[in-house]
Amino acid sequence: MTRKVSRRLQELQKKVEDRAYEPLAALNLLKETATAKFPESAEAHIRLGIDPKYTDQQLRTTVALPKGTGQTIRVAVIARGEKVAEAKAAGADIAGSEELIEEISKGFLDFDLLIATPDVMPQVAKLGRQLGPRGLMPSPKGGTVTFDLEQAVNEFKAGKLEFRADRTGIVHVLFGKASFSADDLLANLKALQETIDRNRPSGAKGRYWRSVYISATMGPAIEVDINALRDPKLAEA
């Protein structure tokens, strides 16, 4: 069954040529095509030359977006003793120990990110049914299993986010709001590109970068010139 495309999106698609755009031009076009009646996010969809069914070709890491995400996230922390108070002092929206684990097991999920200290992970791991489907399970690679709660809470509140390649080797990630300036979006997209290059899986073979598309939440896909995005001089511009 063919998916029906709205008249609005059809009109916006006419503005996008079938070619790869220089990064800044692509971002200006993203902003121009963000015409929905709500504040849209800027999305990146990056196809990599990896097969995540092999453990040495999986990508899961974090990026600190220099211009932030434009979103207010609710951070929950599971810890013990003084670490609970430390998390609250750092700005965690929710912090607790066994009682929070119990609440989550009963369906409480009123948060966007969960951080846990290593000593409680055996108990948190039992919440896989609740946390797994929503991508909320803490992980060392994602920077969400740590004793340094102050740093973790502050970084994620400031714009650090976790991302991973899906089972087809595509990274889907929000890198700001369409209302950001094109220069600020470029700074975030460049940070994302550098992080993906820095964390290239050891088992990745052949061409690593296959394609990069960006869009506003309800906008058309815009192809970005990969070589131009990866050019080190772009970071100096």
From Swiss-Prot:
Query: Family assignment?
Result: Belongs to the universal ribosomal protein uL1 family.
State the organism of origin: Synechococcus sp. (strain ATCC 27144 / PCC 6301 / SAUG 1402/1)
Identify this protein by name. Large ribosomal subunit protein uL1
InterPro entries noted in UniProt? Ribosom_uL1_bac-type (IPR005878), Ribosomal_uL1 (IPR002143), Ribosomal_uL1-like (IPR023674), Ribosomal_uL1/biogenesis (IPR028364), Ribosomal_uL1_3-a/b-sand (IPR016095), Ribosomal_uL1_CS (IPR023673)
Tell me the Gene Ontology biological-process terms attached to this UniProt entry: regulation of translation; translation
Provide the leader sequence positions: none
Q: Its encoding gene is what?
A: rplA
Note the superkingdom of the native organism. Answer: Bacteria
Its function? Answer: Binds directly to 23S rRNA. The L1 stalk is quite mobile in the ribosome, and is involved in E site tRNA release. Protein L1 is also a translational repressor protein, it controls the translation of the L11 operon by binding to its mRNA.
Task: Provide the alphabetized UniProt keywords.
Answer: Repressor, Ribonucleoprotein, Ribosomal protein, RNA-binding, rRNA-binding, Translation regulation, tRNA-binding
